[in-house]
């Protein structure tokens, strides 16, 4: 063969002997051959060239992929510039990792079968000249083809933490290396250890090959079975062009176009590095879009999606320009300085890779700030609602007396640098407003605002822990408000916003409280304890209601009151708590330490008659009284026979207050001032057998 021969990888393209080829843009010219079919057939020499090999790589770079497929630098540049449309196994070149934080290992099976070439002394003999032929833009003609087949098994892990990528990749590689020697049992199942099975279950498989399969493998076990079938599927009839030898057309037709020059290795390396760097940015963007936090914040999701589209458009335009420059250089119309200038212009544009990576760094920081806040906030178990219409519907619910809303105030889809990129795409000759994103445009680029946001998130969580009740509801949302940096805790009272920087409820002195909603900050839902209830008390309605007068047979339990008709609640309380009850008849309501005596008929067992209990009482005989340690005092009430009693315990302050409840208002009745030493239990005395009076209560 002549010394100026050109050797190129077939890349799934349908080469045949005698076919014409334009090396300036690496395009086949189908439908035309230099010689008649009969002449080609007579002049073809075929030789057997059987071989097979397998190789494993843990890289996803275009260099390593090209090396596996024997692609030289010039053809690689054409592929990167979008000049070459690949097919068959070569589609592997287009298969890129979706995420940067993802492990990938590729197994290649390669086989060759035979080599065909045209006789070197064919020369211009039998060349078909015509006017049509003179207009065909071909620089070379195919004179040799090596046949065979490639198969690529691409194994990908799920997205993982960045610190685990290498470790998981190593585990994958160790297992995949065993594929050629893995045994398949008589039941056609792959024999693996339990540890190997755990590893292989964690990754997927994608197949690119020159073999016809009824179904492509998607799992490790599928891949093993397919791999072991490939040698039997290989043969001359199933082989495809792998490598192609071409000679210049000027050897046969002096007026034919020529491949005048090609770009130097440093320039081709710059092509590769620039395009691969953009791919790396796109993978970072995919990583970010896959983050669960981003799925919550649609504004962030929109920015990342817009950035991804902009990068795709930039990549397409850059590839198209590279393709034009490569063709011009190879045609001799321009020298390689045209490509040099292209990349210099790119460096001086907003699309320089440093700026794109800087934007991604800013966006990743925003995501991390939002994620760190959400990690704190979710411990409060709030309703996370990013639709403002749905949020305000929740706030209008009559059950929501108090709404506390942690609001992200600076999360927006607007981004000045994205606007700059978009404008530059539309008008690349215009002077951009900026070449790179500026930290001052991003609130999260400084530490003080994110730190403040986390402090407010901790406050929000503590409020939720302290006021976990039916009347106070907690929400998380995002409402853009440039006047409030980072975040705020907005307070809504019965759907109306009261404060946008809430820290704690404002509680007046317990004796002066009039608005029932102020007490409902500390609403407490209680349940009566059946194990403590005296035998004559009947509990119902989910142990919320107790009525005296039953004639049940006694049941012995060490916690049960056996003399006084009393019952305690299940939950011991410290902190601040408010509860309400409906009451009628002979009733005492208050709190007691758990250690109150249960079995005697002495004051030690009677609510209010000892140091361990405090009660507010109503009897028909004595009226309203407050009682502690056996000392009682009458309490004047403006509405005799009122039906609803409110009780507010401020354990840290040492107060226990009682209120008459009338719809939205309360009237203070009495406050005990003491020092509590342990949790107290709401407790009730209901009826009196000796006085033959009954009573009932219902916890609200």
UniProtKB/Swiss-Prot annotation:
CDD domains: SPRY_PRY_SNTX
Example of a GO cellular component annotation carried by this entry: extracellular region
The name this protein goes by in its record: Neoverrucotoxin subunit beta
PROSITE patterns per UniProt: B302_SPRY (PS50188)
The protein's role, per its UniProt record: Has hemolytic and lethal activities. Its hemolytic activity is inhibited by anionic lipids, especially potently by cardiolipin.
PTMs per UniProt: Not glycosylated.
Entry-linked Pfam families: MACPF_SNTX, PRY, SPRY, Stonustoxin_helical, Thioredoxin_11
Native source species: Synanceia verrucosa (Reef stonefish)
Domain B30.2/SPRY: 506-700
Tissues expressed in: Expressed by the venom gland.
Keywords, in A-Z order: Cytolysis, Disulfide bond, Hemolysis, Secreted, Toxin
Alphabetical list of InterPro entries matching this protein: B30.2/SPRY (IPR001870), B30.2/SPRY_sf (IPR043136), Butyrophylin_SPRY (IPR003879), ConA-like_dom_sf (IPR013320), Cytolytic_pore-forming_toxin (IPR052090), PRY (IPR006574), SNTX_MACPF/CDC-like_dom (IPR056072), SPRY_dom (IPR003877)
Location relative to the cell: Secreted
Entry's family note: Belongs to the SNTX/VTX toxin family.
Entries under Gene3D superfamilies matching the protein: 2.60.120.920
Protein origin, superkingdom: Eukaryota
SMART domains registered for this protein in UniProt: PRY, SPRY
């Amino acid at each position: 063969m002549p010394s100026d021969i050109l050797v190129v990888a077939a890349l799934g393209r349908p080469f045949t002997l005698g076919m014409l080829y334009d090396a300036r843009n690496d395009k086949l010219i189908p439908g035309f051959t230099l010689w008649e079919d009969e002449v080609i057939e007579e002049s073809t020499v075929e030789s057997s060239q059987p071989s097979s090999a397998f190789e494993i790589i843990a890289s996803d770079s275009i260099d390593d992929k090209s090396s596996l497929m024997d692609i030289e630098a010039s053809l690689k540049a054409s592929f990167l510039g979008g000049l070459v449309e690949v097919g068959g196994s070569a589609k592997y070149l287009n298969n890129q990792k979706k995420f940067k934080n993802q492990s990938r290992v590729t197994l290649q099976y390669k086989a060759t079968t035979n080599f065909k070439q045209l006789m070197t002394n064919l020369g211009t003999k039998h060349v078909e000249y015509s006017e049509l032929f003179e207009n065909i833009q071909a620089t070379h003609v195919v004179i040799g083809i090596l046949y065979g087949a490639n198969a690529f098994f691409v194994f990908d892990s799920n997205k993982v933490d960045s610190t685990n990528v290498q470790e998981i990749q190593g585990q994958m590689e160790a297992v995949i290396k065993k594929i050629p020697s893995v045994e398949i049992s008589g039941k056609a199942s792959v024999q693996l250890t339990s540890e190997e099975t755990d590893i292989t279950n964690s990754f997927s498989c994608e197949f690119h090959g020159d073999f016809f399969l009824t179904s492509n493998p998607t799992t490790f076990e599928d891949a093993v079975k397919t791999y072991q079938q490939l040698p039997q599927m290989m043969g001359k009839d199933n082989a495809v062009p792998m490598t192609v030898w071409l000679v210049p057309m000027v050897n046969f037709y002096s007026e034919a176009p020529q491949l005048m020059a090609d770009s130097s290795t440093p320039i081709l390396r710059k092509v590769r590095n620039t395009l691969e760097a953009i791919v790396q940015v796109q993978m970072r963007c995919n990583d970010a879009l896959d983050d669960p936090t981003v799925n919550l914040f649609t504004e962030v999701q929109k920015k990342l999606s817009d950035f991804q589209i902009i990068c795709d458009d930039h990549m397409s335009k850059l590839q198209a320009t590279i393709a034009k420059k490569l063709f011009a250089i190879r045609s001799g119309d321009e020298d390689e300085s045209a490509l040099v200038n292209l990349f210099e212009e790119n460096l001086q544009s907003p699309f320089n890779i440093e700026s794109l990576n800087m934007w991604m760094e800013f966006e990743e920081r925003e995501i991390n700030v939002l994620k760190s806040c959400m990690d704190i906030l979710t411990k409060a178990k709030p309703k996370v609602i990013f639709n403002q219409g749905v949020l305000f519907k929740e706030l209008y619910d009559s059950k929501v007396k108090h709404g506390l809303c942690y609001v992200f105030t600076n999360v927006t889809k607007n981004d000045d640098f994205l606007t700059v990129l978009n404008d530059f795409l539309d008008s690349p000759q215009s002077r951009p407003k900026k070449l790179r994103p500026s930290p001052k445009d991003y609130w999260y680029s400084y530490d003080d605002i994110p730190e403040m946001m986390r402090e407010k998130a901790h406050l929000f969580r503590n409020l939720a822990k302290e006021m976990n009740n039916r009347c106070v509801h907690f929400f998380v949302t995002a409402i853009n408000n440039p006047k409030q940096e980072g975040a705020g805790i907005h307070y809504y009272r019965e759907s109306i916003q009261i404060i946008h920087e809430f820290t704690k409820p404002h509680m007046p002195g317990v004796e002066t409280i009039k608005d029932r909603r102020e007490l409902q900050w500390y609403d407490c839902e209680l349940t009566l304890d059946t194990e403590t209830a005296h035998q004559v008390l009947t509990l119902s309605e989910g142990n919320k209601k107790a009525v005296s007068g039953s004639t049940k047979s006694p049941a012995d339990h060490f916690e049960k009151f056996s003399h006084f008709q009393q019952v305690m609640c299940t939950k011991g309380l410290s902190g601040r708590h408010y509860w309400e009850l409906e009451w009628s008849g002979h009733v005492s309501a208050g709190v007691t330490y758990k250690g109150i005596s249960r079995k005697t008929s002495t004051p030690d067992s009677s609510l209010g008659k000892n140091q361990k209990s405090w009660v507010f009482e109503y009897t028909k005989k004595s009226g309203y009284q407050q009682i502690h340690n056996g000392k009682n005092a009458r309490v004047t009430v403006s509405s005799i026979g009122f039906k609803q009693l409110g009780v507010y315990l401020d354990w840290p302050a040492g107060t226990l207050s009682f209120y008459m409840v009338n719809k939205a208002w309360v009237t203070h009745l009495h406050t005990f001032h003491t020092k509590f030493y342990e949790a107290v239990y709401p407790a009730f005395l209901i009826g009196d057998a000796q006085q033959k009076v009954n009573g009932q209560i219902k916890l609200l």
